[in-house]
Amino acid sequence: MSSVPPTIGVLALQGDVREHIHALEQAGARARRIRRPDELDSIDGLILPGGESTTMGRLAAVFGLLTPLRERIAAGLPAYGTCAGMIMLADRLADGAPGQQTIGGIDMTVRRNAFGRQVASFEGTVEMTGVDGGPVEAVFIRAPWVESTGPGVQVLGRISRGDTAGRIVAVRQGRLLATSFHPELTGDTRVHRLFVDMVKG
């Protein structure tokens, strides 16, 4: 691995941009906001934060980012999607809105708002493969889950208890990572460290 800190962009259209930047810096990366296609040339990896996935897709199209994002990710740019960002990295949606567009890249089917609306948001812990030090603190806000994955996708984490036990909430495919939850809101930077290591990899 290189000793030079990687530069990781955070797509700054919606979501917890500042919190992701702070977590990336704590995890040993340089971080910058990404709003224009030309800014993609200056980064080694990209975080797609939470927000509202249909709005995020529309904004990405309006800002001329949708096609460049697809091309860069297809060409191997490491990316990490949280919540709505997970939806954006999905190849398929179980319940997509009419005309909803994603970036794709992970061979998975995702269900939006699977855990319920805002009132059903919750915090819990997730045992996550590839993350040392015990369970990860996880904040779920109108969160999706993964309905199914293709053979190249590694399931990293599932809900461990309750009536949603067994639901997939963290996956990896190659240099793409996605979680249903928001680690940037917890102060626990281990998932961001995992992604930084993937980018360095």
From Swiss-Prot:
Catalyzes the hydrolysis of glutamine to glutamate and ammonia as part of the biosynthesis of pyridoxal 5'-phosphate. The resulting ammonia molecule is channeled to the active site of PdxS. It holds the Pfam family SNO. GO terms for molecular function: glutaminase activity; pyridoxal 5'-phosphate synthase (glutamine hydrolysing) activity. In the presence of PdxS, forms a dodecamer of heterodimers. Only shows activity in the heterodimer. Its EC number is 4.3.3.6, 3.5.1.2. It catalyses: aldehydo-D-ribose 5-phosphate + D-glyceraldehyde 3-phosphate + L-glutamine = pyridoxal 5'-phosphate + L-glutamate + phosphate + 3 H2O + H(+); L-glutamine + H2O = L-glutamate + NH4(+). Keywords: Glutamine amidotransferase, Hydrolase, Lyase, Pyridoxal phosphate. L-glutamine binds at G51, E52, S53, R112, I141, R142. Belongs to the glutaminase PdxT/SNO family. This is Pyridoxal 5'-phosphate synthase subunit PdxT.
